[in-house]
């Protein structure tokens, strides 16, 4: 059996512009502290795999310290961690996914197409992709079908399900089932 935790849309370093300045600063501090509470949760519940589906940062160029804090928190986890950058924190020049040193247990998807990672000990195959720009009009799952090979296949993507406008990795419900 595999135990996994999924998360997304942390939006670290958000300005919280609708809040008064002091409250916004408190929320940013709380968001950063949450990372280490998450690490404690993962370790305390024997989680094997952490799947983070994008927009961990509110922009593609957050404060360096925030990227380093996230890397430190993920490094404390005794789980394997996979990250699929989203439309706010897309993978590209200057992004923390390139500028921060990430721990050995963290894999960041870097391509705007599905990449495959295998974990033979768990009979698991993970498919993930990264936004490499703020918009991704073509769906990452278009034309994909998981092979019937007896392995557990998990997809890790940041996107929208059945959107009216295709801007952020449009995903059709039928594609999820494939």
Language-model region placement:
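His/Asp/Glu-rich metal-coordinating catalytic cores
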Residues: 49, 60-178
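N-terminal active-site segment of His-dependent metallophosphoesterases
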Residues: 1-68
């Amino acid at each position: 059996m595999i135990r996994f935790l999924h998360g997304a849309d942390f939006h670290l370093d958000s300005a919280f512009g609708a809040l008064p300045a002091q409250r916004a600063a408190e929320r940013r501090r709380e968001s950063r502290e949450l990372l280490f509470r998450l690490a404690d949760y993962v370790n305390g519940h024997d989680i094997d795999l952490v799947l983070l589906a994008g927009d961990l940062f509110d922009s593609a160029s957050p404060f360096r310290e925030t990227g380093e804090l996230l890397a430190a928190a993920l490094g404390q986890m005794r789980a394997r961690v996979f990250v699929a950058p989203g439309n706010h924190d897309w993978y590209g020049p200057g992004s923390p996914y390139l500028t921060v040193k990430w721990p050995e247990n963290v894999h960041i998807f870097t391509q705007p197409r599905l990449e495959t990672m295998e974990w033979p000990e768990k009979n698991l195959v993970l498919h993930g992709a990264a936004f490499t720009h703020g918009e991704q009009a073509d769906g990452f799952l278009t034309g994909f079908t998981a092979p019937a090979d007896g392995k557990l296949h998990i997809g890790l993507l940041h996107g929208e399900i059945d959107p009216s406008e295709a801007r952020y990795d449009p995903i059709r419900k039928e594609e999820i089932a494939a």
